[in-house]
A protein has these predicted regions:
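Membrane-interface helix/helix-cap signal primarily in integral membrane proteins
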Residues: 50, 60-252
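Hydrophobic alpha-helical transmembrane segments in multi-pass membrane proteins
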Residues: 3, 11, 42-45, 176, ...
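Transmembrane helix-bundle segments that form internal channels/tunnels in multi-pass membrane proteins
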Residues: 1-76, 85, 272-275, 279-284, ...
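Alpha-helical structural context
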Residues: 17, 212, 216, 275, ...
Length: 455
């Protein structure tokens, strides 16, 4: 899977830089047809792999180019940026982010109406900031806003953050500022689709658990950290707390990723395995563990969706699913192949994920851990099962993760953390192996046994 993964990465990168030229697209289409003809004549595994890689390169490249090109079309939201006050309708996608003074909404399926004209469906998404909003706006609500559309603008600092491109990669073509009196909710619950109903249910469960933690845990900062660790909700966590974790080199523990999903998979695999072991026939045949692996996919998928399904969560989810299927098929799992499979699936669905910081950090860390352990697997300390050997492995994991993410952190955040290896010995065991398992267990049982979850 390494070659297809490299093809997807190269295609997504080229799509943002080269595919706006028609001759480049024609050249790669010609290359694709050439590989197709070779594959038809010589159907070997290697030829098929190259053919598939060229296909993935084209798909990711053209998809990436189309994402960036939408903003330049005549149907884009861009075209309404200088037309004064408009009637803007859209569907709230994702969870509304409530701050101290304003609420941030992301609108999709946008239509725009000028005074004296019919509504017009526009391409792209809108970020809407509503000031003084008291009533609750939920995911999948259809809303109308009376305001003007502004284009995203970069600061003129050389080498500064490219805010315009950042929003364009998310499909966001404009920004709207409005007061609470300018916003109206149009659509009711009985008109929601199944997908929208699921999104709303998941978001409401995250909010309900966040309120449960706030009422149970006396310290507000502790409650906010527990909420972030278990549900991925960032709006409840003070900026000061996030900065403290970042300076200590432990901000990765706050992101829902491999650690959290592995705990969920492990907890439910053990639970279902215990249940199915009660059947003598399943126990004798050995099918209890395979059925438990399949059953664990249900709560694992639910938790991945509930946490927001960020690129780091997607990577961890796909790798765990590949591992579970390898376990069921009784085949030896390959970490690098699983990582490459995750990259291929994510980039084929959304090539813009390549430019996400969470995607880069997550994949770089895991890649360095996998490659690092191939180098030290014959070291006696790494093969030692004693406490000292486990501490050595733990330190190696932290070191390889730091080495992989070090350049990315420097580039994006202008920050270097020299104490991460030290803090990893304290923070990760305390949070990762005590707080996170307890928090996740509490989340799954609090709807049924709230007193036990509070304990």
């Amino acid at each position: 899977m390494l070659l297809p993964a490299l093809a997807c990465i190269s295609g997504a990168f080229a799509g943002g830089r080269l595919f706006d030229e028609i001759w480049v697209v024609g050249l790669f289409l010609l290359l694709f047809l050439l590989f197709l003809s070779v594959f038809v004549r010589n159907r070997t595994r290697e030829t098929f792999l190259w053919f598939l890689s060229v296909l993935f390169f084209l798909v990711c490249g053209i998809s990436m180019a189309s994402i960036l090109e939408q903003g330049q079309s005549e149907h884009s939201i861009y075209q309404y940026s200088k037309k004064g006050k408009l009637t803007i309708s859209g569907t709230v996608c994702g969870k509304p982010e409530r701050g101290e003074r304003r609420v941030k909404l992301l609108l999709s399926d946008v239509s725009v109406k000028e005074k004296g004209h019919e509504p017009y469906k526009a391409e792209g998404r809108l970020t809407v900031y509503v000031y003084g909003l008291k009533h609750h706006v939920r995911c999948a609500d259809r809303v109308t806003v009376q305001s003007e559309i502004r284009l995203p603008r970069n600061f003129a600092n050389p080498g500064g953050f490219d805010y315009e491109r950042f929003l364009a990669l998310k499909g966001i073509r404009g920004i709207v500022y409005a007061g609470a009196h300018d916003l109206t909710v149009l659509e009711s619950e009985n008109r929601l689709s199944i997908a929208d109903s699921m999104k709303r249910t998941i978001n409401s469960q995250r909010e309900e658990f966040a309120r449960f933690l706030s009422s149970t845990v006396e310290n507000r900062k502790s409650a906010a950290i527990f909420t972030l660790l278990t549900t991925g909700l960032t709006t409840k966590t003070p900026e000061q707390v996030r900065q403290s974790f970042a300076k200590a080199g432990a901000s990765h523990i706050l992101a829902i990723s491999g650690l959290h999903l592995s705990i969920v998979a492990g907890i439910f695999f053990s639970f279902f395995n215990f249940v199915f072991r009660q059947s003598e026939s399943l126990l004798i045949s050995g099918a209890n563990r395979k059925i438990a692996a399949f059953a664990a996919l249900i709560p694992l998928t639910y938790y991945a969706l509930l946490s927001g399904f960020s690129p780091s969560t997607q990577r961890a989810y796909i790798m765990i699913v590949v591992f579970l299927f390898s376990y069921v098929a009784e085949k030896q799992g390959d970490g690098l192949n699983s990582l490459c499979a995750a990259a291929v699936m994510i980039l084929l669905l959304d090539p813009a994920s390549l430019f996400s910081v969470s995607f880069q950090l997550s994949f770089a860390a895991v890649l360095f851990i996998i490659c690092g352990f191939t180098l030290i697997k014959e070291v006696p300390a790494a093969r030692n099962k004693s406490l000292g050997g486990r501490v050595f492995i733990f330190l190696c994991i932290s070191f390889f993760a730091v080495a992989g993410t070090f350049p990315i952190v420097m580039y994006y955040f202008n920050m270097i953390c020299f104490v991460q290896l030290v803090t990893s010995l304290v923070i990760i065991p305390a949070l990762g192996f005590v707080c996170v398992p307890l928090g996740i267990t509490a989340f799954f049982i609090f709807p049924f046994l709230p007193d036990l979850a509070a304990f």
